[in-house]
Amino acid sequence: MENAIEVRGLTKVFKATKGREKGGEKKAVVTAVDHLNFEVKAGELFGLLGPNGAGKTTTIRMLSTILIPDEGEATVGGHSVTKQESKVRAILGVITGGDRGLYWRLSGRDNLMFFARLYNMPDRAAKERIDLLLETVGLTERADDLVERYSRGMRQRLHIARGLIHDPPIVLMDEPTLGLDPAVSRSLRDIIKTKLQKEQGKTIMLTTHYMWEAESMCDRIAIINHGGIIAMGTPDEIKGSVKLGSSLSIKVTAFPSSVVFAIESMDGVEKVVSEGAAEDGTSNLKILGHNLGGNVAPIVDLLVKNGVQVLSFEQRSPSLEDAYISLVGEGAGV
């Protein structure tokens, strides 16, 4: 099987009530996913990025058979998500986050046994599988504690174990490290990338809020905005597609907005992003463009002439975040 997931023209429309008019209620039509097309190769770790409301979670829900598409088709493991739902669910693991989906008054082990029985797993096989999963996610020593005593990171580990209870070859993850501290996030990324993908050969599709996480983990990435894909490829391919040669990060004191427009008018400059003021009153200007090395002196000179103090600057190659900002726009959260 070359492609584990195939999506063709997938569309989902929601109708929301806006208020009352003569003759009844007015319905606002929101196209959450608009004729989406992509494939996820077998054994691949595929990332889906985009602003809030772009359609990431809606896509995950359609692929997991929770939502029915209004148009288009998708297959998971060769099975249709609209015509072969039970076959899709048998080979698919779905891992979300947060506090829902677990029984807090049960132990971690008992939670996993409950979900194993939903898959009609024999108790002996389930116990062996649970022991293996608890070891995989690092919860063996706390397996018999009540979930209500777990930290958020431990609950997220249990979510991962729950989604893998039936050993699915294909796994969907919706923001698996959201809101976790850096140490816990790093541990979970290692579980996902090393243990699940590399060692067990699972196909993984995930959404994430963190650009650097996607850049370091994903084999390929699709950026979605307004329900449609605007860029897709490896992290390097996406960075190359927006033709951002380099970026310059300058830490400065307060500056007039006219400075930003003046810098953007310089040759080779594509975009200037102000990353906001810190508590000490300083700001960071991120300048994206081509051959910026020759612009350093003119930019510094411009800032000084406008009474702006330059505290530091750093030039580097563009990151996935730089490409994302160029494609989606400044201020578009993911």
Residue ranges with predicted function:
Residues 191-290:
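ABC transporter nucleotide-binding domain
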Residues 171-175:
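Catalytic Walker B motif of ABC-type/P-loop ATPase nucleotide-binding domains
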Residues 167:
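Conserved catalytic motifs of ABC-family nucleotide-binding domains
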Residues 160:
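Hydrophobic anchor residue at the start of the ABC signature
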Residues 113, 117, 124-142:
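Conserved ABC ATPase "signature" region
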